[in-house]
Amino acid sequence: MVIHLGDHWDMPSLSSYDKGKKSYEGRRYKADVDAGNEGMEMLLSRVKRMKNRPRMVFLKGNHEDRITRLIESDPYLEGAVGFQDLNLDAWEVHDFLEPVEIDGVHYAHYWINPLTGRPISGSIDNMLRTIGFSFTQGHRQGLWAGRRELNNGKAQRGLVAGSYYQHHEKYLGPQGNFHWRGLLVCHEVHDGDYNLMEVDMPFLRRRFGPQS
């Protein structure tokens, strides 16, 4: 099984935060879509050669959801732009913030405080206590992993991993780009618990990148 936690398409052309800034100049919707589709083709190239393809789950992130907000603010664009532009045919797609439960672990792009609508944040221990069940999310750069042993003999897992890329983010500045980046493999997933294996970007480059 492969689970993509979202924000594959960055969609900077639809960013409401950067409009009017010099850095916004030259951004185009089509360029954003094409970049994400090209990356998706690269991601799926090995999977498509497999005889027995795994279940593949894609959770829309807040960056993909910029398309939804665009159509809501400018309804005349409906049909001209939309999620049909994104190369998601190979995936079981779930809407932004829609929870998906698999083997006792609940997945979403991020988890919100139901009273405020804001993302639950803080330390992984705080998130475990606040959310109350085994969860995995993306959204935040870096890696946070936690485990609570419960009095009923079960365990609660918390996992936050929202960075799978090689570039630096300008908005994070010169001191904010040292976060962990990579993918995670969860073995023996059952009843909300699992054995966790971290696979960081430097390892992936050495193992699968061009050989000099």
Q: Where are the predicted features?
A:
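Beta-strand-turn-beta hairpins that frame and shape the catalytic cleft
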Residues: 100-106
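Short, acidic/polar N-cap/turn motifs at the starts of alpha helices
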Residues: 95-99, 183
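Alpha-helical hydrophobic/aromatic positions enriched in membrane-embedded helices and signal peptides
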Residues: 53, 101, 130-131
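A generic local structural motif
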Residues: 45, 93-95, 120-125
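Non-catalytic C-terminal accessory modules of carbohydrate-active enzymes
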Residues: 209-212
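General small-molecule cofactor/ligand-binding pocket signal
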Residues: 57, 89-96, 108, 159, ...
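Conserved beta-sheet core of the metallophosphoesterase superfamily
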Residues: 106-203
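Core catalytic region of metal-dependent phosphoesterases/phosphodiesterases
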Residues: 1-92
